[in-house]
């Protein structure tokens, strides 16, 4: 047995397989650490008691309006061949197809622009007991409710932002760690339950 081991030259061993065997445990440990960190953060937020700081009752109406463009697109796409067939059969005038398509496309464009305007609109803001972590519940482009956790130290107050918003009733929520990640807050249409804490976090 020893003679067979001595005959095997180390140079003949496939170095790529050796390197892959050495790298795989390190990658597995890194992925396991990242997964454990995500699970820990999720479990921590699940067992944390949250208190509502801000709420906007009309957020459900905004979400429904954002989802309406999907039905508009389906109705326009499905009804166009039917209107065209009826026009070819002489049941409808030739202008009916143009009118139907114009109404459908115009409505779809209007709803899409409204969805872009209401994207990342915050409906609820929660704070934990230690007041060092916020949970934002907002509406995405498709009208679905999304939630994200933000540390209070990562918030950029209004007095530290470069240029104020052109719309006075819209206040942007900016982060120090990611300048491209922004959320929208409606001051006039929302209800603030803790005014002192709200102004301390987001400004006047």
UniProtKB/Swiss-Prot annotation:
Record InterPro entries: Tmem186, TMEM70/TMEM186/TMEM223
Compartments, record wording: Mitochondrion inner membrane
GO CC terms, sorted: mitochondrial inner membrane; mitochondrion
Chain ranges passing through the membrane: 70-90, 96-116
Keyword terms: Membrane, Mitochondrion, Mitochondrion inner membrane, Transmembrane, Transmembrane helix
Keyword Transmembrane: yes
Family that this chain belongs to: Belongs to the TMEM186 family.
Subunit composition and interactions: Associates with mitochondrial complex I assembly intermediates during its biogenesis.
Name of the protein: Transmembrane protein 186
Organism: Drosophila melanogaster
Lineage: Eukaryota, Metazoa, Ecdysozoa, Arthropoda, Hexapoda
Name of the gene this protein is made from: Tmem186
């Amino acid at each position: 047995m020893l003679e067979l081991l001595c005959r095997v030259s180390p140079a003949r061993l496939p170095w790529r397989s050796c390197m892959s065997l050495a790298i795989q445990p390190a990658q597995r440990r890194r992925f396991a650490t990242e997964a454990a960190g995500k699970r820990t953060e999720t479990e921590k937020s699940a067992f944390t008691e949250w208190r509502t700081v801000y709420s906007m009752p009309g957020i459900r109406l905004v979400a429904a309006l954002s989802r309406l463009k999907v039905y508009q697109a389906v109705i326009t796409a499905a009804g166009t061949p039917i209107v065209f067939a009826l026009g070819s059969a002489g049941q409808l005038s030739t202008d009916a197809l143009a009118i139907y398509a114009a109404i459908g496309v115009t409505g779809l464009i209007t709803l899409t622009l409204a969805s872009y305007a209401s994207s990342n609109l915050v409906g609820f803001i929660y704070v934990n007991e230690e007041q060092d972590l916020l949970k934002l519940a907002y509406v995405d482009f498709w009208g679905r409710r999304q939630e994200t956790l933000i540390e209070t130290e990562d918030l950029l107050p209004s007095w530290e932002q470069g240029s104020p918003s052109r719309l006075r009733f819209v206040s942007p929520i900016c982060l120090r760690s990611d300048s491209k990640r922004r959320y929208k807050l409606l001051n006039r249409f929302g209800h603030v339950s803790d005014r002192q804490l709200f102004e301390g976090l987001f400004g006047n």
